[in-house]
């Protein structure tokens, strides 16, 4: 292609901006205004009634100010219309009977505020373990007596049931001895699976025998420490059995017409299902031993619903009385717990049986301290302090069921009954664990009095105070009692010798102290914790509790100047010697600071403490630290840096940033934040001085610029460095630091050749050229206003950048290099104008320095021609079949650039634009709609002043035809 000279058209930016503005239309009073409320006039005309229709509407017209969206509605919404046409009686007031029914329904269900058994189950299995050997009787699965044909007479049925059950007791079992706890759990799981397999294979009697065998295990207390966990495992099997029986009978009620409703009555149950249900109860009634008979019947308690409405209410008191026959108090209390669990599930409204279980338990409570139990403990070598906590899960569950939504009078009566019993620490602990926190909190002094009267040998008082503290963390005691409560509790806690017992109690009472007292009391508590946990490095075994204490303190002290003035707070942090735990605690503190600190701070107490905490987080970073962890730490440190402000003391602010840079040099996001903060500091200085720097402020902003120039090279991300060089150069330019700005821009230009072909973004490799193109376009916008250095040639920065672009290795399939050259052409065209589009205050750009000098314009034109030659040469290389689409798009893009920036009165440039137009359409690759819109734009512009030559150009631009 021939060489074409470049001629930039003269631009009048103010006139162009004015021509682009929307036409202003004066508004008279009352005329339309976009912010004025919409006034809708609604007209209703009489409808023409159709054949068979008697409806009509009256004519009316109304005008009102309404929501514009409501204008689409022509009347009442469909749901309101439906409600209006419903039976008036249905919308009447609620009758007394319906109100009673509603109250009854509320008591018929257990709400989400009731802690389910599943939560306690996991805790029990984890807590009650043993290393002693266990034994189990394993069912061998004899098939003798399998129920086949039905007996004709009732006596035959009874005999058959007894024979089936006796078969189990006559040798169909094998005793396994010396099992570990895990082996025992595995065997129980085998029994559970055998139960399911037997049921699936229709061996119902075998399934019942397995359940009976498992229930018998609950009478064995030979390894007493494991009993609570054994109870959990075996009642899981009982629950499975109860569910299978219920589902079996329920399925018998389903016929081809309908299924059994959720809230069915016995009248909905057919005779076959009732007969089967009775058969199960008769089989269970034939079990000779009390404990298995009780547990198996309790497991299918829900099946009473198939027989009668009052079946459950009649059965629960009988089962409650059956438990009186169990002699061992531990076995007895867990039987009551199971009955309460089943009862609260199937009939939560039947409170009487729950209450009776509780009061029956109180009557037998003294058995715990009787000779029989004492002899058993001696035989097994178990201390009373280890034995009594075995009751806690069962008692806690009974108390929870009884106290759930219980009236105040009942709770008071229960408390008084417990108070009358001697050695009642175990009861007291269960009361405080199960009763509502508000009930316990309002009677805190009463409970403290009861705790004092308890015998220390039976149940540790510190556990009672811990239970009390848990309640006071949820509800507030009377204000006048608060200090006395703390003093009474802490007297006991601080005397504890065991560090583990001490920290378990102290952790709970820290919450109470923070809620109701000042930093003085909190400081005293923290000092006491340090005193108890430092000897023999006891804190190493209690990191979770110590972390919990820190979290509770910072949750209540949102004013960090107060928090860090607590003398023992930082020494408390020193107990976290393990690095991972220490870092987690520091992160917790920083998260609280970022969340709750509302105003920037310069408080030296806060700054010194948080710098120490941030330094701890930073120093934990090593080569093995995950990127996510680094991002989290950097985010927290950056949040702190943003909240530090020394007001107008800019020098102190810069000193803080210098110190921060030295402390946090291993986290790149923190260094980036510091650079942005220092640049912002320089711009704030400029704002204060209104652009007129004094000698002092000029030196200060140069110091800021130097800070950035020194820090940027230490960063790893190449585009981070490029963008920061550009941003910092712009800040330097705005503060009249011209030589420093040149240094930033030269550094950016020198960095471009180092840009790799691909970069990693979110763990995936991406081509870097789009990012480089974006950066260079931003760079060109800045270069427009950068004045030339007097000791260098004309447009020396542009020349250096062009050389770098030329030498950079671009992808063969990419046109980004030409897009960059096109942007350079736009830049050079803007530089040739008499007055530039924008300026920086108090910085003379090249339009002022050269004042339209012919030598400057000649150099500019030479660069333009060189760039044009590169563009045209690239277009020439795209004349291949696979690249014709790219050639068409680039040709049209270059045409638009000439149209926007070139002087088309020049014949050669005019001819070049025509050639590009033809090139874009030559191979049918151009988008016809785009070409039509472009031509329409040219014709529209030709009507503007001094644009007549575009009319002739439009005539020379044909549109391709589709043939």
Swiss-Prot record:
Organism name: Mus musculus
Name this polypeptide is given: VPS35 endosomal protein-sorting factor-like
Similarity field: Belongs to the VPS35L family.
UniProt-annotated stretches for the region Disordered: 43-112
Coiled-coil residues: none
Quaternary organization: Component of the heterotrimeric retriever complex formed by VPS26C, VPS29 and VPS35L. Interacts with VPS29. Interacts with COMMD1, CCDC93 and CCDC22; associates with the CCC (COMMD/CCDC22/CCDC93) complex which contains at least COMMD1 (and possibly other COMM domain-containing proteins), CCDC22 and CCDC93. Interacts with WASHC1, WASHC2A and WASHC2C. Interacts with SNX17 and SNX31.
Keywords tagged on the record: Endosome, Membrane, Phosphoprotein, Protein transport, Transmembrane, Transmembrane helix, Transport
GO terms for cellular component: endosome; membrane
Function summary: Acts as a component of the retriever complex. The retriever complex is a heterotrimeric complex related to retromer cargo-selective complex (CSC) and essential for retromer-independent retrieval and recycling of numerous cargos such as integrin alpha-5/beta-1 (ITGA5:ITGB1). The recruitment of the retriever complex to the endosomal membrane involves CCC and WASH complexes.
């Amino acid at each position: 292609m021939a060489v074409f000279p470049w001629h930039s058209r003269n631009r009048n930016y103010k006139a162009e901006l004015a021509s682009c503005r929307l036409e202003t239309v004066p508004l008279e009073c009352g005329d339309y205004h976009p912010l004025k409320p919409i006034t809708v006039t609604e007209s209703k005309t009489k409808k023409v009634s159709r054949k068979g229709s008697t409806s009509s509407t009256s004519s009316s017209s109304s005008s009102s100010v309404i929501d514009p969206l409501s204008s689409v509605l022509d009347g009442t919404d469909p749901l309101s219309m439906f409600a209006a046409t419903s039976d008036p009686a249905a919308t009447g007031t609620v009758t007394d009977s319906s109100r009673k029914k509603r109250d009854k329904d509320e008591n018929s269900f257990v709400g989400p505020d009731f802690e389910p058994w599943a939560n306690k189950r996991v805790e029990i299995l984890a807590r009650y373990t043993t290393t002693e050997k266990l034994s189990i009787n394993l069912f061998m699965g004899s098939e003798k007596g399998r129920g086949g044909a039905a007996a004709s007479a009732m006596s035959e049925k009874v005999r058959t049931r007894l024979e089936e059950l006796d078969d189990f007791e006559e040798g169909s079992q094998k005793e396994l001895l010396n099992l570990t706890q895990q082996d025992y759990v595995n065997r129980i799981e085998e029994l559970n699976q055998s139960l399911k397999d037997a049921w699936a294979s229709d061996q119902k009697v075998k399934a019942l025998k397995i359940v009976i065998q498992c229930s018998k295990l609950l009478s064995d207390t030979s390894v007493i420490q494991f009993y609570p966990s054994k109870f959990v495992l075996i009642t899981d099997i009982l629950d499975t059995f109860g569910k299978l029986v219920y589902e079996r009978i329920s399925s018998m009620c389903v016929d081809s017409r309908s299924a059994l409703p959720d809230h069915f009555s016995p009248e909905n149950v057919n005779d076959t299902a009732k007969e089967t249900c009775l058969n199960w109860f008769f089989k269970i009634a034939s079990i000779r031993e009390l404990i298995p008979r009780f547990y198996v019947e309790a497991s299918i308690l829900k099946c009473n619903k198939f027989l009668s409405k009052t079946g459950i209410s009649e059965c629960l008191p009988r089962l409650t009385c059956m438990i009186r026959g169990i002699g061992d108090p531990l076995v007895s209390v867990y039987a009551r717990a199971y009955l309460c669990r089943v009862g609260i599930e199937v009939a939560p409204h039947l409170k009487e049986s729950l209450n009776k279980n509780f009061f029956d338990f109180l009557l037998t409570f003294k058995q715990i301290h009787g000779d029989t139990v004492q002899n058993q403990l001696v035989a097994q070598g178990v201390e009373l302090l280890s034995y009594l906590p075995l009751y806690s899960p069962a008692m806690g569950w009974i108390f929870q069921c009884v106290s759930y939504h219980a009236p105040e009078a009942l709770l008071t009566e229960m408390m008084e009954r417990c108070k009358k019993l001697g050695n009642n620490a175990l009861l007291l602990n269960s009361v405080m664990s199960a009763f509502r926190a508000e009930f316990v909190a309002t009677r805190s002094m009463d409970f403290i009095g009861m705790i004092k009267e308890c015998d220390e040998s039976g149940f540790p008082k510190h556990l009672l105070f811990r239970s009390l503290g848990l309640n006071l963390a949820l509800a507030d005691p009377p204000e006048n009692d608060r200090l006395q409560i703390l003093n009474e509790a802490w007297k006991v806690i601080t005397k504890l010798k065991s560090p583990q017992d001490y920290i378990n109690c102290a952790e709970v009472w820290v919450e109470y102290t923070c809620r109701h007292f000042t930093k003085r009391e909190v400081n005293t508590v923290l000092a006491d914790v340090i005193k108890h946990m430092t000897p023999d490095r006891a804190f190493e075994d209690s990191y979770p509790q110590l972390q919990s204490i820190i979290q509770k303190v910072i949750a209540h002290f949102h004013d960090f100047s107060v928090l860090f003035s607590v003398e023992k707070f930082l020494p408390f942090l020193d107990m976290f010697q393990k690095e991972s735990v220490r870092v987690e605690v520091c992160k917790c503190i920083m998260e609280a600071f970022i969340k709750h600190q509302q105003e920037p701070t310069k408080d030296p107490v806060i700054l010194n403490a948080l710098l120490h905490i941030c330094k701890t987080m930073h120093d934990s970073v090593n080569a093995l630290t995950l990127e996510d962890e680094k991002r989290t730490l950097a985010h927290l440190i950056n949040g702190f840096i943003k909240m530090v402000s020394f007001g107008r003391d800019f020098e102190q602010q810069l000193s803080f940033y210098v110190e921060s840079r030295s402390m946090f040099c291993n986290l790149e996001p923190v260094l980036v934040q510091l650079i942005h903060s220092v640049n912002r500091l320089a711009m704030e200085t400029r704002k204060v001085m209104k652009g007129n720097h004094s000698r002092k402020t000029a030196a200060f902003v140069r110091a800021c610029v130097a800070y950035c120039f020194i820090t940027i090279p230490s960063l790893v991300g190449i585009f981070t460095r490029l963008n920061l060089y550009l941003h910092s150069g712009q800040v330097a330019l705005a503060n009249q630091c011209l030589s420093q700005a040149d240094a930033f821009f030269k550094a950016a230009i020198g960095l471009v050749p180092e840009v790799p072909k691909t970069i990693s973004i979110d763990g995936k490799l991406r081509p870097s050229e789009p990012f480089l193109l974006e950066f260079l376009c931003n760079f060109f916008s800045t270069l427009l206003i950068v004045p030339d250095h007097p000791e260098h040639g004309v447009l020396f920065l542009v020349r250096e950048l062009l050389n770098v672009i030329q030498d950079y290795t671009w992808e063969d399939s990419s046109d980004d290099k030409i897009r960059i050259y096109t942007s350079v052409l736009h830049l050079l065209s803007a530089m040739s104008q008499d007055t530039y589009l924008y300026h920086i205050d108090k910085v003379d750009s090249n339009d002022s320095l050269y004042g339209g000098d012919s030598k400057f314009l000649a150099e500019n034109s030479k660069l333009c021609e060189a760039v044009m030659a590169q563009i045209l040469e690239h277009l020439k290389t795209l004349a291949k079949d696979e690249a014709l689409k790219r050639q068409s798009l680039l040709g049209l893009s270059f045409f638009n650039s000439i149209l926007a920036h070139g002087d088309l009165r020049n014949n050669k440039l005019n001819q070049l634009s025509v050639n590009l137009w033809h090139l874009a359409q030559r191979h049918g690759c151009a988008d016809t709609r785009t070409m039509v819109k472009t031509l329409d734009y040219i014709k529209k512009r030709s009507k503007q002043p001094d644009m007549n030559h575009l009319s002739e150009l439009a005539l020379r631009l044909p549109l391709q035809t589709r043939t």
